[in-house]
Amino acid sequence: MRIASLQPSISLTLSYLGALDTICAATKWCVEALPELGERRTPLLPDSWSFAEADQSALLLTRPDLVIASVPYRPESLTAILKAGVPVLTLAPHTLADIYLDTRLIARQVDALPLAETLIEQLQSRLSHTTSTCSSLTAQTVYCEEWGKPLIASQPWIAELIAAANGGFVGKPGAQTTADAIALTDPDILFFSWCGAGDRVPMDRVIAQRNWQHLRAVRTGRVFCIPDEFLNTPSFNLLEGLDCITHALHPSHFPRHPRMKQLSAPTVAS
């Protein structure tokens, strides 16, 4: 089986399933999430948001048996992928339950369903343990953002991770919002995990541009950048995102993930 993977979550899932060798093409975002693809000099293609008819020849040169694409899509890009004439599996997860189903779909393509079930059980067990541990700890409100212009709150599966850590998700997951609307909720914690930004969200500049200096999270230094691939790529690396979330909410009970970044609280003049 030769698979063209058009989103990082697909590449990561195949890697977790021990099927990295099936990837015959990927995207630059896949390489950022999984550097081994770069080391292998895997041919690069546009993702399922930017793929165009002009990219069909490059896709066909990689001789895929199957293209696997996932959200986010553009209708024009999906049409161009389908017109290439290669079988396409399209995924659109919203919840953790969707992610489990998608994992099984991918696993069936590479004869790895037993391993997929084991990985799913491990993730579910970890979430159950987190929920049990955090249920007696202080509940807190959390705003988590996947995009800054316009402001878009993170996806429902991330709200589920936050809920497992006894956090209340501010706003509607996956929906567009405004700086003023978030300011009115005055959340305890701010998470930034912008798609494609890795761990490079300029938190201090964002806070200043939105006039959020007065928010509780800013005043107490509880503003964090969580690497994009830990939250926005729906695969088993979500466990690393959960590590970041649990530490941010309950720092005395959970260790700090080395890749999460924190904005310091402002210095108060004496």
Language-model features, listed with the residues they occupy:
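N-terminal ligand-binding lobe of clamshell/alpha-beta domains
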Residues: M1-S270
